[in-house]
Amino acid sequence: DLDQEALRPWFPLPQVLQGLFSLCTRLFDVEIVAADGEAPTWNDDVRFFRVKRSDGTPIAGFYLDPFSRPASKRGGAWMDECLGLSKKPDGSVVLPVAYLVCNQTPPVGDTPSLMSFEEVETLFHEFGHGLQHMLTTVEEPEAAGISNVEWDAVELPSQFMENWCYDEPTLRR
């Protein structure tokens, strides 16, 4: 049996995010950059990120709300749609924005949030849902991203991403 608590020092949130974002660059040729302050947030712990093509063209954004707040947030982890990719009547494009919400232990002092391997898997899983939403190229709201995905396929991107937690190059990052 694996002791999840013993693994926490190996998975500080900043390094896990760096590994996840690096994986997304390798797999999808996108860059994920912090954009804190570019979008309003509902809590000081919430971060905002931009997703860009390798040429720098913005294609999406997402909020990351990583830490537990039992008084104001339900348990578990989830991804949801904030804005879907769509085209306005004037021809301009609304870029997709996702929410990624987790309930990890907050940082303590100078020590970052330390994740169990199960929490790492959960983050990758939920980010897979987010990628399906953010990387869509369909501009029709009823067919873009996570909209109207058949139930037998809804977990495919999330489980695909989750499996990368066992990839040695991903773990080394």
Where are these regions (language model features)?
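Cation-handling catalytic/transport regions enriched in His/Asp/Glu
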Residues: 1-173
